[in-house]
Amino acid sequence: VICVWSSDVCSSDLDTIQHAGVVIGFGGIAGHTFIGLHKSENSYFNRAMCAQDYSAVTAACMMSKRSVFDVVGGFTEELAVAFNDIDYCMKVRKLGKLVVYAPYAVLHHYESKSRGLEDTPEKVARFNREIATFAKRWPDILKNGDPYYNPNLTLRKSNFALRDRKKIGRASW
């Protein structure tokens, strides 16, 4: 059963990927895959062009059954700006439903145009509260890693590159 679906979201320049799924752990909490990849470039195993399960997708372009939205309580109000979509997807996955990225439709998105950047002390404080709230709600996946992401790949970049050799332990598979 597919519950949440998201498409390829391109940045305002119309030629590069802005959102193509979310990996828990990118940037410490969660981040988007393939940021800045040009639409003509190949991605890691061409994943940017393949439908696939992810732990989360962006709400910039998300579809979900209303019944599931109601069952999980919708978006968490304590996550007013950041991580509310990721938290929602995590709640959906907890029900045993799938979160799927499908690159068949493309949306052009002007990220942060309406709300702006975290460029004031108040916005930075809100963002830090939302990081703490998300971390408190989902400590296990933050500790154990994203089940849809190979632990031998880096969490510092969104390009699926190998981790630093010093940090690679025995493969989990």
PLM region spans:
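Boundary detector for helix-to-coil junctions that initiate low-complexity/charged tails
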Residues: 140, 146-156, 163-172
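Acidic/His-rich active-site region of diverse nucleotide-sugar glycosyltransferases
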Residues: 6-72, 95, 106-118, 122-128, ...
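Catalytic cores of secreted or luminal carbohydrate-active enzymes
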Residues: 129-130, 136-143
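Single conserved hydrophobic/aromatic residue that forms the stacking wall/gate
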Residues: 1-9, 171-173
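Acidic donor-binding loop at a coil-to-helix junction in glycosyltransferase catalytic cores
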Residues: 57, 81-87
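Residue-level detector of anion-binding/catalytic polar loops
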Residues: 98
